[in-house]
Amino acid sequence: MTELRVKMVESIADIDATTWNTCATSDGRFNPFLSHTFLQALETSGSVGGRTGWRPLHLLVEDDAGLVGVVPMYVKGNSQGEYVFDHGWADAWERAGGRYYPKLQAAVPFTPATGRRVLPVRDEPDLETALFSACQRVAEETGVSSLHMTFLTKAQWQHAGSLGCLQRIDQQFHWHNRDYASFEELLGQLTSKRRK
C-alpha cells in the first residue's frame, strides 16, 4: 500500500453518498446507523455540530490506488450522547493537570449499537489496519487528548488491540423480544420487584 492521504471532512454532505455507503456495507451487512442518510440527518437536523459537543470530522482515506475507506469521526467537547460514562476519567485527567477535551471519537452519535467504525472500501484486514493508522495520525495532528472508538464489533475491537490500542471492557444489557404480544404480557413475566 502506498502512502495514505487523509482528508478530514467537516460535513458528511461533502462525501459522495454512494462512496460512503459502499464502505459502510463492504462487509455485506447493512447497518442503518452507518448509512450516509442517517449521519446526514443528524447533521442537517442540528443534532450534531454547532454547540452540541459533536463536531463532525469524518475521514476519507485514499492511496495511489484510490479509496481505502471512511470513518465516522467527531471532535467531542464533552461526553454527552456517547453512552460511555467517562466523566470520572475526564475529571481525573483534569485534576492531574491535563485537558481531556477535545477528544476524537469514532462513533455513531447517540447510538449505543455495536457496529464497525472503520469502514474499508473492501472487507480486507490491510485496509482496516490502514484506517486505524489514519485515525491515530489524525489524533496526533489535531492535538486532541485522545482517540476513542466506541461500540466496535468484537473483530474490530480485537484488531485495534493487536495494533496497540488500549481496549476498554464494559458491560451491555440487551433486551430480546420473546414474541410478547403486548407490554402487559412482558410485565406479566417479571416479578413484582422487576416491574417498577
Specify the residue positions occupied by each region the protein language model found:
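N-acyltransferase acceptor-side catalytic subdomain
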Residues: 1-196
